Each structure stands twice: as C-alpha cells, then as structure tokens.
From Swiss-Prot:
Organism: Rickettsia akari (strain Hartford)
GO aspect biological process, one term: DNA-templated transcription
Gene Ontology CC entries for this record: DNA-directed RNA polymerase complex
Keywords of the record: DNA-directed RNA polymerase, Nucleotidyltransferase, Transcription, Transferase
Domain of life (superkingdom): Bacteria
EC numbers, comma separated: 2.7.7.6
Name of protein: DNA-directed RNA polymerase subunit beta
Signal sequence range: none
Amino acid sequence: MVSLRDNIEAQPLSHNRRIRKNFGHINLVADIPNLIEIQKNSYEKNFLQLNIKDSERKNKGLQSILNSIFPISDSSNIANLEFVKYEFDTPKYDVEECSQRSLSYAAPLKVTLRLSIWDIDEDTGTREIKGIKEQEVYMGDIPLMTKNGTFIINGTERVVVSQMHRSPGVFFYHDEGKVHSSGKLLYSARVIPYRGSWLDLEFDAKDVLYFRIDRKRKLYATTLLRAIGMSTEEIIKFYYNSVTYKLVKKKGWAVKFIPKHITAHRLTSDLVDADTGNVLLKAGQKITPRLAQKYCAEGINNILVAHETLIGKYLSEDLRDPASDEVLAKIGEIITSDMLNVINDLKIKNVNVLVINPQSGPYIRNTLFADKNQDREAALCDIFRVLRPGEPTNIEAAESLFYNLFFDSERYDLSEVGRIKMNSRLGLSISEEVTVLTIDDIKNIVRVLVELKDGKGIIDDIDHLGNRRVRSVGELIENQFRIGLVRMEKSVIERMSAGDVDTVMPHDLVNSKILVSVVKEFFSTSQLSQFMDQTNPLSEITHKRRLSALGPGGLSRDRAGFEVRDVHPTHYGRICPIETPEGQNIGLINSMATYARINKHGFIESPYRKVKDGRVIDEVIYLSAIEEGKYKIGQANSKVDRDGKLQGEFINCRVEGGNFVMVEPHEVDFIDVTPMQVVSVAASLIPFLENDDANRALMGSNMQRQAVPLIKTDAPFVGTGVEGVVAKDSGASVLALHDGIVEQVDSNRIVIRTLEQKIDGSPSVYIYNLLKFQKSNHNTCINQKPLVQVGHYVKKNDIIADGPSTDNGEIALGRNVLVAFLPWNGYNFEDSILISERIVKEDIFTSIHIEEFEVIARDTRLGPEEITRDIPNVSEEALRHLDEVGIIYVGAEVKAGDILVGKVTPKSESPITPEEKLLRAIFGEKAFDVKDSSLHVPSGVSGTVVEVRVFSRRGVEKDQRAIAIEKQQIEKLAKDRDDELEIIEHFVFSLLEKLLVGQVIINGLKQVKAGQTITTEMLKGLSKGQFWQLTVEDANVMNEIEQIKIHYDEKKDALNKRFATKVEKLQSGDDLPQGALKVVKVFIATKHKLQPGDKMAGRHGNKGVVSRIVPEEDMPFLEDGTVVDIVLNPLGLPSRMNIGQILETHLGWASINLAQKISTLVKEYKNKNIGIEKIKKFLLELYGENINYILERSEEEIISFCNKVGKGVYFATPVFDGAKVQDVKDMLKLAGQDPSGQVKLIDGRTGEYFDRLVTVGQKYLLKLHHLVDNKIHSRSIGPYSLVTQQPLGGKSHFGGQRFGEMECWALQAYGAAYTLQEMLTVKSDDVNGRIKTYDSIVRGENNFESGIPESFNVMIKEFRSLCLNVKLEVTSS
C-alpha cells in the first residue's frame, strides 16, 4: 500500500503496505522491470504499434509487412494496388464479455488501399494514369492483447510463449572427430537465413571442400565460387599468397625470407644468405620463428634454396615460354621434375608459386582441380541439376534459380540481425539494409572456413546466447501475417487478371478470409500458443516469461542433445539456471531471469552497474551476451565502501568463456546489479535459496506454480522481498489508475474520485468492479477483496484490492504453519505428512474450485430442443432446485446426479394406438414424443451453484431466467452510471456555489429577486436545475459558468451514451454456434478441505502426501500448550540437502516469538508498566535504521504499527544476499529463544516430554493442485469394453481398478481360490455370470455360478484367425 513517506493526509498506519525486516546488504539501484513487458512490448509496441499516429509509425511489425507485400501489380502492369495506412476500430466486446460469451477479443483491422489504373499505349509503350480509387478495406479481426499480456481466443485465456531459436547468420563448427574413424576434425560452415535456403560448406576426410544447398547432394565448393562469377585465377589469388623464386646461376633459387612462414623444425639443408653466400645455419640444426625473426632484423632478405626445392610446389600464375609466350603450365598446376627440366632448359628466370605450408593448406587448390566445372555456365547448370533433378537444364533457368536462392529479397532474408552477425563474424562492413547474401559474403565464408582448417580462429559455440535469439509474440505473429498476406497477394493478382479492372474497387480484390484463417490457425493450434497456466498468479507470470526451444522452426525434444539443454555461462543474468521442467523437456523450456530484458534484435540483456576507475556508480547499463564478452565483470557481493570504491587488492571477475580471473579494482568494467538477477521470478521467491541443492530448488520453483489459491491468504513470515512485485505485475491485484480519494467500497466494487483537476474543473471518477468467484483456466477460484476504506487517499499504482493468492499486496501461495521435525508412529514415513485436526477445522488449507457445465439447446431435424422444467418420468423431488424455466437456482447445494438444467429433445414418433388417435381427434393436441436430455451433475462433483449464464440466439425469444439475469446486469450498470454522475454533480455544484456566492443577480427567480447578493443559504433553497438559470453581473463568472455547463453536459451525455451502448449489447441477443438456440452455463463451486492423499510442499522442493489427520489432543505440543500443526520427518532432509527449509523454520520460530514479545510490550504499555521508549528501542533493535520514519510518529501510530505485526514479524531474506546463520541466531536470541532453534516438546498421547530437543518453527507450506478428490474414484456398475467385455479403466470413463498379473499372483500366494475366480470371471468379463450374480443378489441369495470369460472367446477367435479351430468340448465323466 501507499508508503508513509509520501502519504498526503497522514493516514493511520493500518492503511499501509507491510513492512518487512530486510536482511539484504546490497542497495538496489535498479528496480525489477515490469515482469510481463516482454509480451506487451513485443505485440503492442513492436507489432501493432497501437496508439501511434500513422505518420509516426516505424517500418516494423505490421507496417513493414504491409509495405513489403504492397504494391501488388497484375501481370500486364495495368492495375496497381498500393498500401496507404492501417488502423484498428474499437473491439465489439470487451475482455470480460468475450470470456463470458466464448468469443475472441479482437479488433477489426481497416487498411486504406489505393488502386491505380494505367493506360498503356500499345505502339509507344508509354503509361498514363487512367484513374485512382482509394478505399478503406476490412482485413479481418486481429486478436488484441489484454492488459495482463494474454489473448482471449474463443473465450479462453491463452499465452503465446517466446521461442529461442538459432540466430540467423553464419556459424562455423566441426564434427568433434565423430564422423571419421581416425578422429580427424572435419570443419563445416552453415549460413542460416531468417527465411530462405540454407547453405552448408564442409570438408570431407580427404580435405576437399564441398557445399550443399538445403541438405541436398553435395558439390565442390569451387562450383559455388564459379557460379558467383569467379575465375580460376581470381579464386587462387583471393585465397593464396604468392612468392617468387629467382634463378641464381649454378647455385639454385633465391627466395624472400619470410619469418611468419617458418615453423620450428630441423633443417634438412644449410640455410644460406642469397645476397652474401654466408651459411647461417648448418643442416640438422633447429630453426624457430623467433630465430628467423632475429635474422630478418639483422638484414637477411633472401635465402638460397636448391634447384629441386620447386618440385611439389604449385604455380600461382600460368607458366609461359619467354620466347613464344606459349602457356606451358596452367595456374595452380603442381611442378614436377619434368616441368623443372623444361624451366631449366628454357632458362626461365622467375617462377611464381603459391605459399603453401602448415599454416596455409592446399585445400582450395585441390578442390579446384577435382572440380570438372571450368566456367560459370557449367557451374550454374550443375547446381540446377542437383536442385531440380529430372528437369531439362538451360542457362536462363539455372541463372534465375541460383539468383532466387540467395540474392532475391522476396525469397531470401537474413534479417537485420543476420546481417549484423554476418558482418561481425566475417569482418565485413556491408550495410544493415542488405539482408540477402552478397558475393563478398560467400567468398569470405570460404576464407574463414579454410583459416579454421589451418588452425586460425575458433569455432562458434551454438549454445552461446549471442548465437541464440528470442522470437517473442509480435515476431511469431508477424511471420504468420506474412504467410497470410503472401497467399492473399496471389488471390489479388488472380482477381485483377480475371475481371474488368476499370469497374472494380479495392475491396473487390481483397479476400480477408485468407489472412484471418492463418492468424486463427496460429492462435488455436500452434505449439507456441498455449492454454494459460492460471493455477495462481505466479504460474501466470512464469508462463508469460517462458522461453521454449521447441515449436515450429525450433528443436524437437527427441533430437535435442545434452549440450543444448545444459546451463551455459552466458545464461548468467539472462536465463534462470534453476527453473526448468523435470522430464523430457528439461533444459529446452526455460524461464527468463528476473532482471533480464530482450533487446530490439531479440538477444537477452542483463543489467550491470558501471565501474569507473575502481568506483561503482549508479549508472545501470544493459549488456547482451556478445557485448558482455568484451568486459571484466565483478560480482554484486564485491566489497564496496560508502563512496562506492571497490575494496580489496583483487576483485573476482567474470571474463569471456565463463572463466573467472582476479583483477585489480581499476581494471573492473562493471559489477552485477544484484545477486538476484541470476534467477527467475519463481526461484527468487525461495528464501535461503543459496542453502538448497540445485535439484531441490528446481522442484521448489516448479511446485510453487502448482499451489492452489486458498480461502484465507497468508503472506509468508519469511519472504524474499519480491512478493509485492510479483503480486503487482501479475495483474491478480487491482491497482489504482490515478491518485484519488475512495468514495465507496463494497465487496463488489471500489469507487475512487481522482484529485487531478481537468480543464473543466470536474474530477474524473474511476469505478473498479472486482471479480467475484470466477473460474480460472485450471478451475481454481478468482476472487478479489478490497483493501481500502472510504476516505482513504490512494496514489497511482497502489494496490487497492487483493486477488487470488495475494495478501495485502504480496503474493501468498500457502500458509504459515507451526511445524515440528520428528518421526511420529511411522505416519510420516517416506515424506508423508501428519496434520493436526485444527488445520481442517479452521479451514487453513481449504480451497475453492469452480467447475463449469454447459448445455446447448439445438434445432434438430425433428424440431427444436427445449429447456424446460417439464421433463418426462422425473419426480418432483429431482426438480426441487429448478426454477419455472428449468434452470437451477443460484445457491442450490447439488451432488452427483442432480439435474442442473432440464432439457427435452424430440424423438422420432412411434406408431399410434387407436385409443390415442381418438383422443387426438377429440382434443386436437399432438402429444410430442420427447426424451430427457437434461444436464446432470457428473459423478464425483458436488458443491454450490454460484453463477448461471443464459445466452439466447438473436431473434429467439428470451425466457424469464434470461430476462431476470439481464435485468440484474442492467441495474448494476445503472448504479455505476448514477454513482459516477452523483460524484461529478457534487463537484460541479460545489464549484458553482463558490463562483456564485457574493455575486449580484440580474434576473429574478421565484425564490430570489434581481439585485440581491447571493448567499449560501439562498442557494440551498434552489433546485439543482435553477443554478443554471441564475444570471449575475460579473461577465467573467458567467463565462466560467457557461464553460462548466458545456463540460457537465458533455460528461453527462457521454455517461448516458456508454450506458445505452452496454444495455443494447445485453438486450440484442448473442452470436451462438450454428444450430444452437440457447446456451446455459452453470458454475458449481466446491470447497476442498485438506484430507489424506492431498499433496503438499514447501518452497524448497520438499513435497509429501498427507497421511493422517490427528486429533489436536494427540499431537505434540509446546510447554505453553501450543499444539504443533504439522509433523514432518527429519530423515527427508540430509540426503536431499535442502537445508534452506531448516533455516526458514528457525527464522519463522523467531518471527512468532518476536511478535509475541511485541504484543507483551504493548500490553505492558497499556497497563502503564513501561513507557513508549522501551517499545521504540525494541523496534529499533529488531528493524534497524529503516524503521526511523515510523518511530518519529505519534505514540498512537507506533502502537497501531505494533498491533499490525499480528502473529508474526515479517522478514525478507533476498536470494544470495539474505540472512546468514548468525543473523538467524541473533533473531532467536532477540526473541528470547535458544539459538539452536530447538525446544522441549511434549507427546500429546502420553503427556511426557520427548527424549531430546525438537526443531520447531513456522514454515510456509503450499497445497498443490494434485488433489485426492480428482484422482481417486470408485465404480459400482459402469460401462464395459466392446471387444473384451471387461470394465473400462480410468476416472473419465467411470472405470474399475485393473486387477493385473501381479495382483493375481498375490491371491495365488495366499491360496484364495474363490476370490481369484470371481475376480477373473463375474467381476471382469463373464457376461452371463454377472447377469446371474445380479439376479441372485436381487433375490437375496448368496450363491453365484461363473461361466466362460469373454476374453477366452476372444482368444479362440484369434486362434481361428490363424486357421486353428479350437473347440471347448465337455467330456462326460
């Protein structure tokens, strides 16, 4: 709630947010970003660009798709359809109406299109404009996002999960030696576009370079280089350096001495300086690059090599005869001994050869000479044959295909991200607008790949977050839109070509159904559009922040290896290392870290504080994984003095590759904002997370999402300080939209008058209608409760009402209960949980679950179905809960089998008897044959009817119940309108009064005469309408009054108009599915108390099932008589290593004891035994300096604050920065307890002390949605399987329990022959036997006969299908 420091009217402290004692040491300089902004920014800001003027819209999202698809021209270029702008109309129904009526919350997309018709002169070919038509065209309804970041599709709330996929760009990797038996590394490169064909380049085991397009058959890489227009000479010159060998008479060849080409080795011949003839090193001596560098520095430029050294080298240009200029050998050819003789014979003085050595291999040259294609045409045709096998090749088709593959922006798109990644990896500077491949790209990809093969550079890590990006909602829907618009483009071109273009309008050309069907399909069936997990507010928020590697264009869970699933150093501060599902999706579905955000390129960024010259400053900078690699980053817990200077000689820092180094303070570039930035929202709610084993923390964060909202919410005594943020951002609580004063409050709504003065001087009124007992997606109950009282001042974004699982604006998933760790008669064996009867009695873990049942009255072939109370063959007793229409009353208590809605269906007429004929002839009535098709409560359900909704088809007369519901809703709307009007009137007339008092009247009314001065008493005698009739002398005052009147009338009209529109919507009838006349929905609420078999869990991954409910008097109790609520097994701790729960228990024990101490002090103060100073001192000791602003207040307010502490002091222990063991001990000491946290406990059954001290404390426990009521069921009689005639299985089929093979063994082991016989026959599939048994039970006899089980007959039939005729013959004895 509103904090004291900025409270205007100094409200009493009761109307205030909860104050927690915080153990955190690190000051937060950055707030947690809005937890659902990832969804809202992506869709509303980047895709739809809602509420942005057309001229100011950027070329992204919907705007960019429409710009790229339009203009559309026909084949002859006569007609041209251009895009002008787009806008959205207001949605027909609001969010609440859509979810009630099972509709999609969507707004109509209106696109303004311009159709230009051209006149083309056939002789000259010149074009003239013949006509232009501009029109707004409806392009279908586009789903809108609700304020909570979800979509409503067909009445259900859905979330579009963000997808992690490999970023477009170029990636280099090797096979890790797995492919070739020798373990040789085979390097490859892959170009991944955003859309278009993939290009792979790869080495084979013989070091020849190949390429593939879309994983088709491989071709030589030089074919690709020739296809982009490179000649042999260009290829060789681009990839190799050249060196010239000069002839030295009778001595050999002189060649330039280049140290970088030399590797360490022993010389096979002398190293001789070519200029002086001096021997530098003898044969057999070792030369190293360092020694070579030394010789170079000493001025050695050329060295002498033997004649035969040239053998085996490759020519770097054509070898020509000096006399005739005839080509003797082509570029790239190897010099053989024969060729060397020719060189000597022709006295060729200079020979240029390629520099090929261990640092630069001959791979490209070898590939060139292996490749048969010698020119561009042959290369293109070869590529064409691979991609289009069986088609006749011609050069035009081949050229067109190759161009379309990589160089046509309509078919190939690297995206801006892909271009940036490509430029940075290849060291290019091509413009970011060029999103197709260029010739430079291809040349350089080959170059980098060859350099990798030569040992230069490193391969890419595909799991690095710089190489994986996030596709959020906006982008996913943008891709669907593009598909839909491309399909629509084809139909537009067809329609342009088909008809007379002169007469058509733009709307005749556009078929919006194509686009709508694609968008609808995405929202209904895509793997990434998911039914929202709405168990509690945390599960909602987590679902919206989820990152999935699965889905279209992503990985498949069967093929994903260990590396993809593993935690990567770049996940730090971006993806939570803890929260991921157990099972086959582990590591593929992740959660974003608390502080992470997604940048415009789709990379996840994490915030860091800047460090300048060893001093930490408050500037926060977000870095992506790529940028982070350039810096040294210290941890958030690095020691810092008051001035922000880093303490210590060395600071532990993270550097690229996830390594840690120790550096001096001035070398540090950034430090983490907070230790909490590493984990996700769910993990950040676990106190003492640092003391838990990772596996258990994973379970803890996952199980918090399964906690069902309880009737009474209770925030944890031991929290982490994040509870308030989660409650606020989840949308479960109601936030004030403006500052204001609370005018009215009840359980259904809150009315707030704002303080903000408008132009007209009248305040606006905000009415917040609260949700009462609504059903969530997971059948839990959504119920909101007001937190404010009349007269309270609230600030914008204050929480004014709690939602499900929230308590005073903080998330509250479970309850604080008193727990003891000790074994108790084996009832807490293997994680079982023993609970006290008090928990059931006081509804501590009771939850409400709401189920929806629907019945549809349809128009059938034989006539309409009817919803009625008049049902054939049903007793009056069965109809007791139904009204005269046949629909159940709200508030009725129902159980399985009760009728909820009476419905009859016409059935085909049976032949009529003569008597009936006579009766019909006399009375003229046709007694319809109808059958009962009423809606009954299914088995296993019981509860109270909380709501009934009736929907009638437009044009169908409404029944009395529908009219009553409608009347109720209209009254509610009228009350909202009247209250708002009343507040506005009150303000307007008080303003008028201020203006009129003291003015002189010009015109007279009955009660007042002209010339009189107006007084307050005089105005009290006038009606509201007469205020406006008064005219006064002051012209300025009259102007002001006129202005107020105009604004007042406008507001009044707007209110009435809004009311009329809503009423019209209610009265107009509903759009129902085809053939439906009426739909009735009944909502039944069931109270689930905690019972044996229910699953419970703590926040540390400690889960168990309730085994027994023990009477309070038998439970262990403390020395003061307090009975323990829950007994847990201490053996569940050591092996699981989630010690956090013990620290939580100890701190919880301190919490309740401190609260008792505070209440004792308050009692003593009230009895005048102590002064306020003693209480102040204790509070200061407990809360520290943070409490000073409360201690400065009046005595009453301090006592009010103490009373508000209630049953426990609230603590916040942030993850990785929370209370240490010593802090917990200090709190226990302050509370007057033993620092061990253990106490003497008395056995409730014997009244004796337990032998040793027991750990007791307050622990936060959750009830999970695995309730025993939804799992266990029993069957008496029910359906049988058609073939085997055995009872069906499973709760949904009302099936039996399978008595399997091992169960049969158990009976055999005990020799229970008769039990076994009846299990296998009459209780299973002996059809005749079970009929006879039924008969004998009805007659009251106790004997039964069993016959042949049906499964035996099935087996015989199977034998017969194998041509074995097995008969069962009875032989007479």
